[in-house]
């Protein structure tokens, strides 16, 4: 009995991370299989070729264990709960973001992955700003604003995946030969560059929804600085 209680508590504690991994993993697999399917062309539909079954079998991954839409709601609402309860130091972090933007501070990071680190940290800051504005506008009713929750979740997913990927690349720097580091490093850089651009798209959808297309100039200045 104690085992199941502990298991339930642990699952609850990491519900946001669990949802992120489920969504990203299933959608990344879908993208890979779809690209492979495209290579086969019309033959991809023929059962004698490998992609037909892979394409069919993978489709269920976005449905079971909670559809990806539901998991986006779960991770979005979980982070809101953590922010409101003070568990993650949301107010303190938001104050740091305000100071960073107001005083035009530099990240202070120096290294090979400076651009990637700054992109990821900017995404986290954008998430905090958008979450704060959403809470200010909708209060306790934020949980019913599915479009806002979905876009907040998309920013969160990028931040989590990019941060985890880059952290692993940097940790492994002294463990493997340079030859074995090249591909993981390029993957981290490409993912951060390609998906980082979309963070502002998600942010604009959230803020335009809140302010009916008239985002305050002060808020725009913050986003432009980041």
Regions found by a protein language model. Name each.
Residues 1-226:
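Alpha-helical interface subdomain recognition
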């Amino acid at each position: 009995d104690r085992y199941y209680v502990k298991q339930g508590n642990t699952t609850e504690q990491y519900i946001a991370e669990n949802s992120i991994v489920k969504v990203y993993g299933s959608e990344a697999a879908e993208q890979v299989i779809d690209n492979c399917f495209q290579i086969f062309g019309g033959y991809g539909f023929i059962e004698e070729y490998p992609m037909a079954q892979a394409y069919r079998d993978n489709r269920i991954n976005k449905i079971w264990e909670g559809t990806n839409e539901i998991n986006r709601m779960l991770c979005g609402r979980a982070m809101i709960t953590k922010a409101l309860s003070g568990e993650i130091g949301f107010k303190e972090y938001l104050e740091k973001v305000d100071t960073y933007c107001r005083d035009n501070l530099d990240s202070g990071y120096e290294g090979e992955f400076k651009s990637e680190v700054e992109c990821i940290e900017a995404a986290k800051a954008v998430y905090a700003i958008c979450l704060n504005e959403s809470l200010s506008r909708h209060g306790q009713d934020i949980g019913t604003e599915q479009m806002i929750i979905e876009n907040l979740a998309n920013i969160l997913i990028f931040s989590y995946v990019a941060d985890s990927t880059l952290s692993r690349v940097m940790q492994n720097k002294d463990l493997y030969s340079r030859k074995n580091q090249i591909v993981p490093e390029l993957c981290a850089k490409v993912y951060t560059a390609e998906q980082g651009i979309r963070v502002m798209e998600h942010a604009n959808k959230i803020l335009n929804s809140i302010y009916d297309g008239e985002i305050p100039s002060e808020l725009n200045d913050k986003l432009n600085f980041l």
